[in-house]
Regions:
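Generic preference for hydrophobic
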Residues: 12, 22-23, 46, 92, ...
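Short beta-strand-centered segments that line the small-molecule binding cleft or hinge
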Residues: 1-20, 80, 84-88, 104-108
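Hydrophobic hinge/microswitch elements
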Residues: 52-106
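A late-sequence structural motif
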Residues: 107-149
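Beta->alpha turn/N-cap motifs
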Residues: 1-6, 25-26, 76, 92-97
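Secondary-structure junction motif
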Residues: 44-64, 128-136, 146-152
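Flexible hinge/capping segments at coil-to-helix
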Residues: 9-20, 24-46
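Short gly/ser/thr-rich secondary-structure transition/capping motifs
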Residues: 2-6, 29-31, 101-103, 143
Length: 154
């Protein structure tokens, strides 16, 4: 699995779009808002997920010249969600990270659209084994039932 576009060494099959969303503590004043305005970020305590390469998030902030006040950094998705749940700040994450009902956080779409396309890749010129082909088909079928995530069908 990878974010598309990928290296030309791979043949990719897009399976879904993963949008960025704001996550806030349930008791946050904006928890019931219809969208989260990016312009609000510098006025919030921000919990940042330290990923080696989070191009989408950094590109989004750079594009809108927004510089959040990073209160906490973590490398753990679970720690980030727990910190937001505990009221230590807010965050911006990919929607695939959020499992409904697992954490008591409010999830809001951003006032600007930012998403990534996720796909399955196999090496170009490589014929996947039968079991790999069955797995790939299972993944495509499974993503059809993922609710709010937009599934790409070809």
């Amino acid at each position: 699995f990878l974010a598309i576009p990928a290296s030309n060494d791979f043949e990719t099959t897009p399976i879904l779009h993963d949008t960025m969303v704001a996550i806030l503590p349930k008791d946050h004043p904006m928890a019931d808002a219809s969208v989260f305005p990016l312009e609000q970020l510098p006025h919030e305590n921000f919990v940042r997920l330290m990923e080696i390469e989070d191009y989408e998030f950094n590109r989004l902030l750079d594009h809108y010249n927004i510089h959040p006040e990073v209160t906490y950094d973590t490398t753990s998705d679970f720690a980030l969600l727990s910190m937001v749940e505990a009221g230590l700040g807010i965050s911006i994450v990919h929607s695939l990270l959020i499992k409904p009902g697992r954490y008591r956080v409010a999830t809001l779409p951003l006032n600007v659209k930012q998403s990534r396309e996720i796909g399955i890749a196999v090496k170009k010129g490589f014929l996947p084994s039968t079991i790999t082909q069955l797995f790939l088909q299972h993944v495509v079928d499974y993503t059809k039932d993922m609710g709010e995530i937009t599934v790409i069908r070809h």
